[in-house]
Structure formats: structure tokens, C-alpha cells
């Protein structure tokens, strides 16, 4: 310790000698380069893997880079409309308008709960003019009847020609049964349900009874609401409304304004009421400029959606009956039909598709710079795991880093002489001889033999992972190294 203190005290005198300055510089460079080479050899990664094996599935995509996302809040975007969501393969849900605390559970299966009414039974036949007769004791029969009317029109049910709908009520719970046993009727109803909630597979080809059961339930966040499904419900009711058609153009430049019509030269902010569980999120002029170049981005489609319909969105805040008519008038302005059709085709082909609800982007937390958001795709009614599109966000992070480095290089060229950069480069190159540790090929993580890279999952020696993704114990593993 005394020698170290003496050395530090002599530094002012040492730096007067050019050779001593060179020795200090070489020593610092050698130590730093040695640490970097050890890191690149994989030794630190191996130690980190052994500590976190079986406990963590996280992965870093670079210094200060994080994968983040935001979710559009459909209840604030379309407050007067019922919102739709999918719970599982057989159950879907329609939530009442204005964030109601009740909803309608749509069950598709083969369980018969109601039979044709007999004298003295509680079972009734539903008619187009007396929907409320199925639930006279409900607290809000008019709202429930309105949602059911929209639903039946959306699936194109004809009360005069199609099979009779049965219903009954017990205290505050009512049940409605649609019989889909007739093949042509089943194909028509299920195809319309698929447009609202997603594919139900080849349901109508099954043998036996085929039924849709509707019952009222209490809303308790059973699933995440999908505003695209609500728009589909509007479109499928469009034959009852007078609509003006307008489609988004493919190639044009556009600017942004706030909800009051004032110009926003600094970029665009998604207001807090548009997002789920997130604060105000702003995207600068860089993102807007990218949207003028990249016309295939789902995020840019969403920006156009909000930008073209500022007045419509402001009107949606007035909870009046006239609001519904103006919403029907503006539905083709809210989102282009070809975008919905494109994603529905991808859904039918079992290809991950965009539901225009959740978007991901790579954010550099140190510089507060982010990439252009991209759609978080959906398959079979659920969002893809981060590892399913790992290559995409790693490539996106590489592009973001390249943009940052290019910008920093241009700025540094204005302040730093090129000769100084060359001097640093050649002095660093001299010490690359310490890269011999790369010859050791130290492994960094485990692979299951015969399968691809399990990253970001960290497998134990029993081939398990704490997140539950790898559950089969005792599979043969081998050590591998990050390329």
C-alpha cells in the first residue's frame, strides 16, 4: 500500500518524461485490452451462465439496449362500442360499451342446455323485436339488447329464415342458445365469428350437435380487448348504415398535429389514454421521417390512423347516442380494409399476423434513442414469445447501433483530428496479440443435442428451465459457444 501511495504521489514528476508517459499509456491499454480479450474468450459468459442456469431466461441485446413495447388501449379509442377478445379455443368475450362491468361469454361447443319450449317451461324463443324478453330482470336490458343486436347482425343471423334461437333466465343469469347443426348455417355463422374473434378451425365438419351458448358474466379482465375485432363488428354491421369510403394512400408524405389541430414539429406523442399500463410515449421526427420512407410498417399505419382521425377521436369522448352514428361514418377512415384483409389471410394460413394492438421497439436507454416500432405478431390468439422473433429484434438493435455510431462518427469528425483516430487505432492493433484466449474455445451455454440454440433460456444439467418452456427432464445436453 505504501508503494502505491508513493507511486501516486510521484505521478506529477513522472509525466514530465515522454518515455514514462508512453509506458503508462501502454500499460493502461494492455490491461484494458487484456480484460476485453478475456471477455471475448467466453470465460465471463460461462461464469454468468453457471450462476443463472435454470433461474433466468433474460438476454441482453447490447449495452444500454432493451426490448420494450406498448399496447393500444381500445376501450378509450372506441368507448361507445362493445369490445371483443378471445379467452381460449372455445370461449370468447364481448364487453359492454363504456367500460361496462358486464360482458357476454360466447361458448362454441356441443353441449345442449336448452330444448324447445313446452307449456310451463322457462325456455323462450328469441325474436328480432323482443330480444329483451329473454332477460327481463337484467339491470341494463337496453344495453345488453343493443350489443346482442349488433352481434346477431354481425354474424348475419336471420331471425325469419335461420334456426330459432332459444333463451331462458334464472335470477340474474340468462342463457342464449344457437343451434348450428345445419351445415350451411354453421359455415356462415362460424366464418363470421372467425372474423371477429379468430379462427375456430374446421368446427362445422365435426359430427354431432354444434351449438353456440351466450351467457352474461361479470367483467374481470379475463382477456385483453382487441380494437380490431370491434372494428370488424362495425364493418360486418355496415350493411345497415350509410358509409363513405376512403382508403389510405400508399405513397405520400405527411405531418402530425395534436388533438386540437396545432402543429407538432417535435414529433408525435401517443396520448396516455391510448396506451395500456404506460405513461405518455413520444416518437420524434426520426420515426416520422422513417414512416415517410417505409410504407409497409404496421406502426406507421397506426400513426396514420390517429393522425387522419383526430376530429373523430375527439368526438368519441362525448358519450352520446349520436357518437355511434359518427363512428360508423368514420370506420373506413380509422383503418384500411386491405390491412385487415392482409392479416386475416395470414391468420387463416397459420402465419403470425398483426392485430395492430401491441408493438415492440429497441430502446437505447443511455441515449434515449429507439428504433421504429414494429408490430408484435400473434399466432393462435396469443402473442409470440420474445425468442420466436429473436433474430428480428437483434437485427433491429444492430441497425439502431449502426445509426447511432454513424451519427456519433459524423459529430466526432467535426471535433477530433483524423490523425489522432489513426494513432489510437494502430496502438490498439499492436496489443491484439493477447487474443490467444480465443484459441481455448471456452463454452458459454448448454444445448439440447439435436435441437437449435435455446437462448435466451439457460438450461440446467437436467435440461430444464425455470420459466417452464423446457419441461422434459434428463434430455442429453452438450456445451456450446456463442459464435
From Swiss-Prot:
GO molecular function (one): metal ion binding
Q: Which GO biological-process labels does this protein carry? A: fusion of virus membrane with host endosome membrane; receptor-mediated endocytosis of virus by host cell; virion attachment to host cell
UniProt xrefs under Pfam families: Arena_glycoprot (PF00798)
Binding of Zn(2+) 2: at which residues?
Answer: 445, 447, 453
Q: Which GO terms describe its cellular component?
A: host cell endoplasmic reticulum membrane; host cell Golgi membrane; host cell plasma membrane; membrane; viral envelope; virion membrane
Which residues of this protein are annotated with the site description Cleavage? 58-59, 249-250
Record gene name: GPC
Q: Which residues lie on this side of the membrane: Cytoplasmic?
A: 33, 444-483
Specify the glycosylation sites in chain numbering.
73, 88, 130, 179, 216, 355, 363, 380, 385
Could you identify this protein by its name? Pre-glycoprotein polyprotein GP complex
Amino acid at each position: 500500500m505504501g508503494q502505491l501511495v508513493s507511486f501516486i504521489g510521484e505521478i506529477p514528476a513522472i509525466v514530465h518524461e515522454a518515455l514514462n508517459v508512453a509506458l503508462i499509456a501502454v500499460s493502461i491499454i494492455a490491461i484494458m485490452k487484456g480484460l476485453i480479450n478475456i471477455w471475448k474468450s467466453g470465460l465471463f459468459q460461462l461464469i454468468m451462465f453457471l450462476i443463472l442456469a435454470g433461474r433466468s431466461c433474460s438476454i441482453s441485446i447490447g449495452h444500454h439496449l432493451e426490448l420494450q413495447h406498448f399496447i393500444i388501449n381500445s376501450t378509450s379509442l372506441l368507448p361507445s362500442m362493445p369490445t371483443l377478445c378471445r379467452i381460449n379455443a372455445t370461449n370468447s368475450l364481448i364487453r359492454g360499451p363504456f367500460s361496462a362491468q358486464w360482458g357476454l361469454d360466447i361458448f362454441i361447443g356441443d353441449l345442449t342446455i336448452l330444448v324447445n319450449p313446452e307449456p310451463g317451461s322457462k325456455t323462450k324463443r328469441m325474436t328480432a323485436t323482443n330480444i329483451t324478453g329473454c332477460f327481463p330482470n337484467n339491470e341494463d336490458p337496453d344495453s345488453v339488447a343493443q350489443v346482442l343486436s349488433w352481434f346477431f347482425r354481425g354474424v348475419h343471423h336471420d331471425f325469419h329464415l335461420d334456426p330459432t334461437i332459444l333463451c331462458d333466465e334464472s335470477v340474474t343469469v340468462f342463457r342464449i342458445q344457437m343451434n348450428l347443426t345445419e351445415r350451411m348455417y354453421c359455415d356462415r355463422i362460424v366464418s363470421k365469428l372467425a372474423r371477429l374473434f379468430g379462427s375456430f378451425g374446421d368446427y362445422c365438419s365435426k359430427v354431432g350437435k354444434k351449438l353456440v351458448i351466450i351467457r352474461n358474466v361479470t367483467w374481470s379482465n379475463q382477456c385483453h380487448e382487441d380494437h380490431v375485432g370491434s372494428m370488424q363488428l362495425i364493418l360486418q354491421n355496415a350493411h345497415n348504415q350509410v358509409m363513405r369510403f376512403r382508403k389510405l394512400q400508399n405513397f405520400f408524405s405527411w405531418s402530425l398535429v395534436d388533438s386540437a389541430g396545432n402543429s407538432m414539429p417535435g414529433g408525435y406523442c401517443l396520448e396516455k389514454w391510448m396506451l395500456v399500463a404506460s405513461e405518455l410515449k413520444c416518437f420524434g421526427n426520426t420515426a416520422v421521417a422513417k414512416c415517410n420512407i417505409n410504407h409497409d410498417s404496421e406502426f406507421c399505419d397506426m400513426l396514420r390512423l390517429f393522425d387522419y382521425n383526430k376530429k373523430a377521436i375527439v368526438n368519441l369522448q362525448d358519450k352520446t347516442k349520436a357518437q355511434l352514428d359518427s363512428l360508423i361514418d368514420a370506420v373506413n377512415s380509422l383503418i384500411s380494409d386491405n390491412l385487415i384483409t392482409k392479416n386475416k389471410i395470414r391468420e387463416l394460413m397459420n402465419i403470425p399476423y398483426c392485430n395492430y394492438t401491441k408493438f415492440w421497439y429497441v430502446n437505447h436507454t443511455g441515449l434515449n434513442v429507439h428504433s421504429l416500432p414494429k408490430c408484435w405478431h400473434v399466432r393462435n390468439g396469443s402473442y409470440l414469445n420474445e425468442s420466436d422473433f429473436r433474430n428480428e429484434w437483434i437485427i433491429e438493435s444492430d441497425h439502431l447501433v449502426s445509426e447511432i455510431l454513424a451519427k456519433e462518427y459524423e459529430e466526432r469528425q467535426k471535433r477530433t483530428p483524423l490523425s489522432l483516430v489513426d494513432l489510437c487505432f494502430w496502438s490498439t492493433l499492436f496489443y491484439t496479440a493477447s487474443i490467444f484466449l480465443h484459441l481455448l474455445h471456452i463454452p458459454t451455454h448448454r444445448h439440447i443435442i439435436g435441437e437449435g440454440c435455446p437462448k435466451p433460456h439457460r438450461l440446467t444439467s437436467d435440461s430444464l428451465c425455470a420459466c417452464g418452456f423446457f419441461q422434459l427432464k434428463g434430455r442429453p445436453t452438450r456445451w456450446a459457444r456463442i459464435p
